[in-house]
């Protein structure tokens, strides 16, 4: 029987020109299956159009739904999500999945509500430019042994995490009515030894078993770290540890913020890669470039035009389609914020990433362009089963054009993806394309590519129950099967388009409404309709009932096809068409009214096509708007914006200041601090001196650390001090209250070795106190030598010069250490500055009368520190979304460490001498858009030149009238001050 089946498959392959592969499942569930073409969910093929989202980087659960609605509206049907162990586990065997933004059940619920599937990525290791790559920081002090191997010490640490988070993932699988369709094992773990006894192979088997023990049954996946190794594919040297669906990570842009002409070189070898190494599986780009992170001292995202360009999305993402990719995840789609101390040293506070959705949750043109592809893939079911018919420069009349040619073996639908062969080219090229259709071979003339532009030319393409295109040189945005078949095309304004209906009558009549005039030409293959794309919306009504919309690209950016169902899969008869607004979050039809929920910055016209003759009215965010009916069946009106609203943000005044470095004084009482008395470390990196001064050995992992070392005698002339707290992290030292040196931080140095020079007059015969305060930019990721995430933090070594030894060291860090005394904000929010330990940054803190009337604009005159607090009131209108940030600047040459706390959340780490970030946004929920807000700024000078700011100002990024409810009681996310004197 197997032989007969094999013969049949060979015969079928010869007949269709492509191998046939039956759908496969993992033996645990058939709800999610796959073959060489695509993933299938509940028996239906799915183009996975996914966006990467990290809930930890947006600590307001209600706003997760805001982001999800924006992704859904812009063509996405899936989100890919990291779950950071570090965020949920402040100490060993303690997990928080319920408090505030730690409640990941809400994540799954909101994803389902928005109509998005979920790809779960819980590690244990995640990387993601987050501190320690997502490992729990209590475990990253060296006690994990050889991380990301089968080392027993490591295994005992990570397994409880996977079991705990795995149970929640399992409960939210599609098999249980939830949105999870794939579960990733580990992250970019490179398989270098193909041996079943290899430690990495054993480790991957352990991870698989742990997820299985937790109840996860959906297919497993992994993400290859670029085309450097071949890892964990069942189709290549499978000795164990392989996953069900192999994925590849790729960031090919090589773009430069400083030079917009550099990079932009397409990689055209994805198809070959997948054919070599995962040929029985669908092509899955588990992470594809949606932007790129920026380091300390680098560029700020808003100024990086090359990363923000919609051209990248147009050319690169369509190239992936041409490569037969059918699982496509964009990393990042929304980046968010590295608030608190959650960043790895390679990034600063903002994790905007240059992503399609800005850190402020605003829609960039890049997302609008991405939407055009998302909506196309949503309805193009024939794209989900194609073979590579060919590729190269021979398909066109101009060899400067490269073409991918895909063919569906069942329907013969064709997809020709064209772009400049030199993808960085800015030339305008007009050419003819040779195509194959059911009516034979033919040539489409007058196709134009304007520099960095790509197009998908379709043939034998179904656009409804009774209509098809023989071909079109205009790009299909979407189509709908409503009362009639409705087709939406787009082109750049001024470009020519042509299309032919398949098997349509030759004498079709049509009426045009708009700026693009259509002409008809009889050909042997049918009537060709040609036009030059004008600006705005043009509608063409054909006598066979088909309605065609012709849009210029910028108009298409503000086109939406809101589904009328909640499922991530949307059939052509399950959405309506809306033109004009900034955002359409959703739409529904009730009786004679179409109810639309959306956002608008400026008043715009709106056009709605529902295909329902009973619909006569339009409601926008609950309010009826005046409309008129068009001759072709749509309704047109105007929806309001926010341009008439004046946003007046309060000036920041009435500052109070207190000393946040009282520990500088030799008389400071540190008797309750942790004594550094260890002579051996759990860390394999040997300390440079004893006792061990690694902060992690004493339970302090995040933020500022303060050390006080004591010694006797007046012989010491200085000290050798080595500090390692991440790139760009500085530190300063005081002897008996006098500044003696330090290091201002360097974005190129992971550690610093400094010689402190003592003034003899500052020395005492007994009980000298050397106070060292260190900044912190995060724990390293796995790739940083020598031991990755477990590289020690704090003082690596400290010895006296000139005679004598330290007699006692004490350390202080974040209040409570691993106790997680503020579970809502979580274990990475605070550091060890005195003001933080005392809770001066928290709402409700009452400033004592002894506090100074002083602002950050006055600053400090020497090597000192201040903690500044003030409050302000906001009273924005209830239907407004106004992203707000804090703009800082400092005089040139200022070397200081500045932190911003909004209602208790550390939402800004500002190093004016390193940069680049100086504007720090706060999402609603961290800031109250209606109510009293508490703002605190900590600042300490890294040198005796002092420090001050010259600008501290609230800034509004933009304003939108919104159908989303931002007018909420955020109190539960902003717990207030409680007495903390025990942590002094």
Swiss-Prot record:
Keyword terms of this UniProt record: Carbohydrate metabolism, Disulfide bond, Glycoprotein, Glycosidase, Hydrolase, Polysaccharide degradation, Secreted, Signal
Keyword Secreted belongs to the record: yes
Binding site for substrate: 82, 127-129, 187, 251, 353
Disulfide bonds: 257-304
Signal peptide: 1-23
GO cellular component term, pick one: extracellular region
Enzyme class: hydrolase
Secreted found in the keyword field: yes
Gene Ontology BP terms: polysaccharide catabolic process
Subcellular localization(s) per the UniProt record: Secreted
Record-stated family: Belongs to the glycosyl hydrolase 35 family.
Function noted in UniProt: Cleaves beta-linked terminal galactosyl residues from gangliosides, glycoproteins, and glycosaminoglycans.
Protein name: Probable beta-galactosidase C
Source organism of the structure: Aspergillus oryzae (strain ATCC 42149 / RIB 40)
Lineage: Eukaryota, Fungi, Dikarya, Ascomycota, Pezizomycotina
Gene expressing this chain: lacC
């Amino acid at each position: 029987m197997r032989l007969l089946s094999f013969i049949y498959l060979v015969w079928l392959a010869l007949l269709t020109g492509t191998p046939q592969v039956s759908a496969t499942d993992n033996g645990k569930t058939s709800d999610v299956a796959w073959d060489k073409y695509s993933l299938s969910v509940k028996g239906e093929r799915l183009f996975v159009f996914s966006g990467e989202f990290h809930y930890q980087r947006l600590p307001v659960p209600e706003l997760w739904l805001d982001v999800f609605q924006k992704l859904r509206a812009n063509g996405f049907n899936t989100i890919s999500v990291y779950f950071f162990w570090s965020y949920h586990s402040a100490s060993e065997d303690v997990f928080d999945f319920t408090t505030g933004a730690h409640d990941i059940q809400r994540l799954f619920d909101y994803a389902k509500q928005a109509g998005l599937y979920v790809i779960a990525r819980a590690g244990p290791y995640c990387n993601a430019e987050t501190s320690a790559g997502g490992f729990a920081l209590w475990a990253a002090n060296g006690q994990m042994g050889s991380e990301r191997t089968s080392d027993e010490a490591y295994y005992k640490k990570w397994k409880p995490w996977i079991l705990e988070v795995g149970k929640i993932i399992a409960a939210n699988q599609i098999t249980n009515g939830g949105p999870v369709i794939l579960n990733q094992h580990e992250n970019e773990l490179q398989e270098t030894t193909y041996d079943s006894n290899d430690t990495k192979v054993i480790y991957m088997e352990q991870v698989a078993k742990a997820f299985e023990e937790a109840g996860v049954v959906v297919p497993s996946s992994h993400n290859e770290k670029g085309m450097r190794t071949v890892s964990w594919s069942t189709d290549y040297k499978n000795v164990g540890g392989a996953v069900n669906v192999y994925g590849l990570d790729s960031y090919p842009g090589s773009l430069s913020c400083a030079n917009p002409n550099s990079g932009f070189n397409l990689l055209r070898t994805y198809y070959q890669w997948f054919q070599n190494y995962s040929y029985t599986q669908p092509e899955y780009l588990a992470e594809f470039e949606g932007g790129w992170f920026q380091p300390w001292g680098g560029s700020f995202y808003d100024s990086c035009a090359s990363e923000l360009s919609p051209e990248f999305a147009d050319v690169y993402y369509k190239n992936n389609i041409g490569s037969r990719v059918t699982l496509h995840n964009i990393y990042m789609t929304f980046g968010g914020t590295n608030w608190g101390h959650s960043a790895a040293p390679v990034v600063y506070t903002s994790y905007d990433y240059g992503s399609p959705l800005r850190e402020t949750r605003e829609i960039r043109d890049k997302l609008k362009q991405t939407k055009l592809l998302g909506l196309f893939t949503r309805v193009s079911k024939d794209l989900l089963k194609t073979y590579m018919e060919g590729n190269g420069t021979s398909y066109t009349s101009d060899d400067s054009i490269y073409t991918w040619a895909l063919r569906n073996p069942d329907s013969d639908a064709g997809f020709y993806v064209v772009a400049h062969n030199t993808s960085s080219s800015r030339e305008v090229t007009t050419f003819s394309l040779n195509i194959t259709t059911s009516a034979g071979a033919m040539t489409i003339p007058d196709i134009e590519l304007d520099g960095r532009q790509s197009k998908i030319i379709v043939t034998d393409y179904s656009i409804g129950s009774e209509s098809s295109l023989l071909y079109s040189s205009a790009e299909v945005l979407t189509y709908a099967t409503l009362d009639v078949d409705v087709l939406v095309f787009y082109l750049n304004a001024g470009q020519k388009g042509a299309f032919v209906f398949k098997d349509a009558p030759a004498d079709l009549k049509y009426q045009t409404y708009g700026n693009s005039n259509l002409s008809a030409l009889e050909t042997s293959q049918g009537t060709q309709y040609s036009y030059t794309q004008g600006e705005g919306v043009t509608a063409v009504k054909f006598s066979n009932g088909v309605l065609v919309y012709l849009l210029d690209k910028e108009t298409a950016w503000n086109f939406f096809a809101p589904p009328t169902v909640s499922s991530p899969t949307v059939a052509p008869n399950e959405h309506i068409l809306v033109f004009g607004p900034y955002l359409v979050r959703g739409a529904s039809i009730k009786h004679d009214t179409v109810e639309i929920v959306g956002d608008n910055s400026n008043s715009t016209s709106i056009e709605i096509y529902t295909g329902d003759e009973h619909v006569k009215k339009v409601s926008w965010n609950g309010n009826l708007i005046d409309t008129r009916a068009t001759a072709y069946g749509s309704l047109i009106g105007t929806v309001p914006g926010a341009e008439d609203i004046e946003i007046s943000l309060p000036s920041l005044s009435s500052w109070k200041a207190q000393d946040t470095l009282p520990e500088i004084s030799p008389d400071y009482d540190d008797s309750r601090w942790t004594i550094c008395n260890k002579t051996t470390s759990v860390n394999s990196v040997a300390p440079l001196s004893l006792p061990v001064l690694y902060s992690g050995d004493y339970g302090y992992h995040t933020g500022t650390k303060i050390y006080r070392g004591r010694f006797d005698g007046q012989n010491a002339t200085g000290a050798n001090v080595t500090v390692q707290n991440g790139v760009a992290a500085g530190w300063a030292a005081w002897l008996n209250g006098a500044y003696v040196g330090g290091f201002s931080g360097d974005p190129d140095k992971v550690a610093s070795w400094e010689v402190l020079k003592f003034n003899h007059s500052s020395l005492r015969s007994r009980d000298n106190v050397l106070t060292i305060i260190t900044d912190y930019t995060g724990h390293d990721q796995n790739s940083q030598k020598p031991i990755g995430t477990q590289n020690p933090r704090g003082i690596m070594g400290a010895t006296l010069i000139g005679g004598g030894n330290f007699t006692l060291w004490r350390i202080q860090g974040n209040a409570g250490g691993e106790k997680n005394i503020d579970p809502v904000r979580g274990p990475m929010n605070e550091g060890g500055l005195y003001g933080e330990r005392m809770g001066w940054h928290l709402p409700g803190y009452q400033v004592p009368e002894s506090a100074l009337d002083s602002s950050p604009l006055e600053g400090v005159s020497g090597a000192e520190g201040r903690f500044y607090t003030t409050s302000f009131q906001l009273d924005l209108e209830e239907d407004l979304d106004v992203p707000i940030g804090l703009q800082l600047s400092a005089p040139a040459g200022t070397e200081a460490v500045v932190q911003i706390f909004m209602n208790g959340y550390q939402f800004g780490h500002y190093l004016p001498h390193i940069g680049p970030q100086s504007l720090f946004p706060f999402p609603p929920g961290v800031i109250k858009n209606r109510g009293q807000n508490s703002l605190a700024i900590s600042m300490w000078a890294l040198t005796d030149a002092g420090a001050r700011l010259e600008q501290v100002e609230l800034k509004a990024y933009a304003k939108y009238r919104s159908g989303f409810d931002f007018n909420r009681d955020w109190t539960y996310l902003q717990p207030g001050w409680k007495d903390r004197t025990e942590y002094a």
